[in-house]
Amino acid sequence: MPHQQMLILFGLLPVATNISTWWNFGSMLLACSSMQVLTGFFLAVHYTANINLAFSSIVHITRDVPYGWMMQNLHAIGASMFFICIYIHIARGLYYGSYLNKKTWLSGTTLLIMLMATAFFGYVLPWGQMSFWAATVITNLLTAIPYLGTTMTTWLWGGFAINDPTLTRFFALHFILPFGIISLSSLHIMLLHEDGSSNPLGTNSDIDKIPFHPYHTYKDLLMLSLMVLMLLMTVSFLPDIFNDPENFSKANPLVTPQHIKPEWYFLFAYGILRSIPNKLWGALALAMSITILLTVPFTHTSTIRSMMFRPIMQLMFWTLVATFMVITWAATKPVEPPFTMISQIASTIYFLFLIMNPIAGWIENNILKYN
């Protein structure tokens, strides 16, 4: 292990020659993480975690602080970029069988949960109308837990309703969690280099490797440059593209928005939650929509690692991608027909993919055996 760390240090780590552009998203996530920590620090310097001043402090940052508008937009749009990269990173892991590197996959799924928690806490901080009501709805799900739910919710809120103590602790959590993410990311990378990364063919690449630098460094830099270009263009020309109009109004506990929805990157999980009429089962489905990824390495039954040579699984994978998008779209709509039915069907298909994974593997194994 120390020998491998030395190789990483000097950019001489042997890497498979045939890894494609889909393997670049790990380094892009590292860049996103660094940018979020830096911009977040400069925003925290000017932010005030008080329900009467939080909204005004965001206005102050965007209007009065030199380049504050840029910091705020880079941080907000950077979070969206972070999630785009992480969803592609996970999709690549599913498609090419990277999840068979179990320790790396499990640490990565834990990272995703931490990242989603951090983003949720951050969304509450501007104390806009949608921030407040999204926080109320999501944290209120804890009350669905039998016996302990109400106590846990009161403990999280710091009172009997979302108020000043809630905002203070959410700011503290939003500040501290990224350091946990950085630590776990380091562990994730160390675990990856213990076995080495996979490749599109899903074969052992020990016989065909090249140094990471300069070959893959330049390949990574190209995608990184494109990401930075997209980020800066969005910040400059469409800074409010991901914002909810409701969030430009200060939080008002007496006025409920017509339609409560979190940021776009949570909509698939929120759509699954909304599609189930029961509160407890809805909360469980919400948790399962993420944690079910932990089961994938243990339900792989195929003799072939990559989906590149598995047509049945390819069909299922692209159905999953389409389902993810449909749930995200349906979650932006009001809770009424036909959107409730669409969400329920899409949610069922979403979970079916992960249940059908071992069955598809057995079918493919039998087809290969008899040919």
Curated annotation (Swiss-Prot):
Topology of the protein relative to the lipid bilayer: Multi-pass membrane protein
Keywords assigned: Electron transport, Heme, Iron, Membrane, Metal-binding, Mitochondrion, Mitochondrion inner membrane, Respiratory chain, Transmembrane, Transmembrane helix, Transport, Ubiquinone
PROSITE patterns linked: CYTB_CTER, CYTB_NTER
Compartments reported by the entry: Mitochondrion inner membrane
UniProt GO MF annotations: metal ion binding; ubiquinol-cytochrome-c reductase activity
One Gene Ontology CC term in the entry: mitochondrial inner membrane
Cofactor binding comment, as recorded: Binds 2 heme b groups non-covalently.
CDD domains recorded: cytochrome_b_C (cd00290), Cytochrome_b_N (cd00284)
Binding positions (heme b b562): H75, H174
Main localization category: mitochondrion
Cofactors (names): heme b
GO biological process, one term: mitochondrial electron transport, ubiquinol to cytochrome c
Ranges annotated as spanning the membrane: 25-45, 69-90, 105-125, 170-190, 218-238, 280-300, 312-332, 339-358
Residues the entry annotates as binding a ubiquinone: H193
Pfam families per UniProt: Cytochrom_B_C, Cytochrome_B
InterPro entries on file: Cyt_b/b6_C, Cyt_b/b6_C_sf, Cyt_b/b6_N, Cytb/b6-like_sf, Cytochrome_b, Cytochrome_b_C_euk/bac, Cytochrome_b_N_euk/bac, Di-haem_cyt_TM
UniProt binding sites for heme b b566: H89, H188
Keyword Lyase belongs to the record: no
Extra information: Heme 1 (or BL or b562) is low-potential and absorbs at about 562 nm, and heme 2 (or BH or b566) is high-potential and absorbs at about 566 nm.
Similarity-based family: Belongs to the cytochrome b family.
Purpose: Component of the ubiquinol-cytochrome c reductase complex (complex III or cytochrome b-c1 complex) that is part of the mitochondrial respiratory chain. The b-c1 complex mediates electron transfer from ubiquinol to cytochrome c. Contributes to the generation of a proton gradient across the mitochondrial membrane that is then used for ATP synthesis.
Subunit and partners: The cytochrome bc1 complex contains 3 respiratory subunits (MT-CYB, CYC1 and UQCRFS1), 2 core proteins (UQCRC1 and UQCRC2) and probably 6 low-molecular weight proteins.
Protein known as: Cytochrome b
Gene: MT-CYB
